[in-house]
Structure formats: structure tokens, C-alpha cells
Amino acid sequence: DAVHDRNVAHDVHVTFDVAALLAEQPTPETERIRNARLDQKPYWNLERCRIGETRKVPVELIVNGEPVATKKIEADGSTQSLEFDVDVKESSWLVVRILPSVHTNPVFVEVSGKPIRASRRSAEWCRKAVDVCWNAKQGQIREFDKPAAEAAYQEAREIYERIIAESAGE
């Protein structure tokens, strides 16, 4: 829809084109890929997404890190147009993915001029990551630069603590 009042939640109509290509039938090599752990190469191979013995893969709409809708497509290499409708009640980010192989960049949906505060758990992870990063890097920072670096890291801590307090979901 071309015009929306940004101050109210809306049903968002998501449209996109997607293509995926798999061999018609699994082979010993594709089975090896499918059965490999996710931390083993080839990491992002589409074969990991094949549904059973079919040539289909799941295409998911993700809102704030959570799958909200799934459709299956035939992975025959053709471009297919898909649509999802989702109710967006608060500012959110949306991506489309074929797990665990590919995903789009996020699309940001703003509601009522509010920032995205989707996941307290994610914000807590980021807050802890600031300390991990500081502990790993502080010994490599020149003494002259250390006060400014400490101030920047402290500001990051405070920002993430505020985001944690403002977060709506788990």
C-alpha cells in the first residue's frame, strides 16, 4: 500500500521474488551435505534446506527474529513470486529466509515513531558482547587513547541497558 499512517499498527503485505535450485533427486553427495553438522562445510548449501526427498524448500517470513509464516517452493530454479500478510503492532524488522541457507537483508517497519525494541534477550547479548570486546581489546589500546575508548565503551553499555529496559519481548 502506497500511503500509511505511521502512527498505527497495520497489516503489512510482503511481496518478493525467490528462486532456489536443487537437483531433482538427492544424491550420495547431497545426502552427505544434508547430514553434515551446520558448522561443517559447505555451510550455506541449499541442499541443507531440502524437505525430505522432495525438491521443495521452506521460505519463511521472520519478524523480529521469529518465524511467523512459511510457504514451500519447488527448487527448480524458476523465479517465483510469494506473498505474506503480517500484522505489525510495533516497530519491527522483517526478513525472508530459507533456513539454514540464505536470508535477505532486513526491512524496517516503523510504528508510531518508536524504535525497534523486539528482543530483550538480543539486547542483553549485545550488552554482554560490549564487555567481551572491551576485555579482549583494552590491552591493545594505547594509553593516550584509553580514556576515550573507555568512555565509548561505557556509552555503548548505557545504550544497551536502556534498550534492555525498553524491550517488549523476551
Q: What are the residue ranges of the model-derived segments?
A:
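C-terminal functional module detector
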Residues: 1-170
